[in-house]
Regions:
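Basic amphipathic alpha-helical segments that dock to polyanions
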Residues: 45, 59, 77-80
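Residues within helix-turn-helix
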Residues: 56-57, 68, 93
Length: 152
């Protein structure tokens, strides 16, 4: 395996993934801007809607987001009246969408879908492979970050 970069090429997986994530995030953020949502806020609404009711820790795990960052995002959505929280077991909070939040999610979903469809179409038949590679990169990175897991 070569670690030599050609002129203008960046070989670092971490750098390339961060650059791609920022560019992709900006693309989706522009699509969601008319709804005063960003990509993470939309992902939160979409995942809660899919689950119906969802514990905060399950959402944090699914989106691979630290609790403090999630709580900040949830506070904004709750303040705007899009989500509500109920007490769960212990200190756990159970999240659900309000009617206003569900209505916003449905309106924003159309803009998200246009962007998603364009992205998928641009990859063409390579989309399933690309998606599989993203899942692998995430799983590998998480395993390598967890000293109890090691490299699989």
């Amino acid at each position: 395996m070569s670690h030599d970069a050609k002129p203008g090429q960046i070989l670092c997986a971490g750098t390339n993934l961060k650059i791609a994530a920022r560019a992709t995030g900006r693309l989706y953020d522009r699509a969601l801007a008319p709804f005063d949502l960003n990509t993470m806020q939309y992902a939160i609404l979409a995942n809660i809607a899919q689950a119906g009711r969802m514990p905060t820790m399950a959402l944090a795990e699914k989106l691979s987001i630290e609790r403090t960052a999630l709580y900040r995002a949830l506070a904004v959505l709750e303040r705007r009246g899009f989500i509500c929280t109920d007490a769960g077991r212990g200190r756990e909070q159970i999240l659900s969408l309000t009617d206003t939040g569900e209505a916003l999610r449905l309106r924003a979903r159309a803009a998200w879908a246009v962007t998603q469809d364009a992205f998928v179409t641009a990859f063409g038949e390579d989309w399933p492979t690309f998606l599989t590679m993203l899942y692998r990169a995430r799983a590998l990175s998480e395993a390598m970050s967890d000293p109890t897991e090691g490299i699989q």
